Amino acid sequence: MDGSGKTTQLALLAKWLSASGHRVFVTEWNSSALVKAATRMGKKKNALTPMTFSLLHATDFADRLLYKIVPPLKAGMIVLADRYAYTAFARDVARGVDRQWVRDLYSFAVQPDLALYFRVPIEVSIERLLARRVKLKFYEAGMDMGWSTNPVESFRLFQGKVIEEYERLVDEYGLHVVNASRSITEQQHDVRHLVAAHLGETHDARTGTDE
C-alpha cells in the first residue's frame, strides 16, 4: 500500500542480506523500459482507464519477469521485488476490473517464496505521503475513478478498497503481515526474522536498521 514504507524496508533488507554474504537483486514495479514511457505519458494526460492501466502493468511485469526476475533466480541470487502481482490483484480490482480476470492475466507469474504485506492505516499513509510532497498524485489517489474531487477523500475511498483486496489476499495467498505503523527499526526486525527463518538462518534480535 502507498505510504506503508515498504520501499525503505526492502532497501534495508537488501543491505542486510548483502552484508550477510548473499547476492541480491532488487526489482521495482513499473520499471520496465519497454512500457515505462507509455505509462508515464498516459498518467501525464490522465488517459489511463482501469483496463489500460491493468494491461500496462501486466506488460511491465511480464517483461521484468523474463529479464529481471527469472535470470537472477537461476543464477542463485535472492530477488527482492518492490511490489509483485499482488499489487495488481488489489489495485486493479479496486478500480473495478474483474477479480478472476486479473488473476488469470498474471497466471504466468512465478510464485514467490515469501510475500510480505505492510499493513498501515489509511490516515498514517496519507500523513507519510504528504510529509514528502505537497499533494497526492492523481492515480495514487484514485482520482481517475471520479469518486471525489478532493484528492485526500478520493485517496481514502480508493485505498479503502485496495486494503479490502489485500486483506483478502492474506488468506488466499498466504501473505505475511507486517505492522507498518511501527518504527522502521521494529518493522525491519520482523522482516529480517521472517526472511532468516525462510533461509534457515538465525537472526539476532538486536539487529538494527543501520547494519
Segments and roles (model prediction):
Residues 3:
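Walker A (P-loop) phosphate-binding loop of P-loop NTPases
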Residues 6:
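Conserved lysine of the Walker
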Residues 9:
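Hydrophobic positions on the alpha1 helix immediately C-terminal to the Walker A/P-loop
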Residues 14, 127-211:
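NTP-dependent small-molecule kinase module
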Residues 16, 20-110:
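ATP-dependent small-molecule kinase phosphotransfer cores
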Residues 25, 114, 176-178:
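Structural signal for short hydrophobic segments within the conserved structured cores
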Residues 31-33, 85-86, 120-126, 183-184:
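Conserved nucleotide-binding/hydrolysis micro-motifs of P-loop NTPases
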Residues 82-83, 108-132:
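Conserved phosphate-donor/acceptor-positioning beta-strand/loop module used by diverse small-molecule
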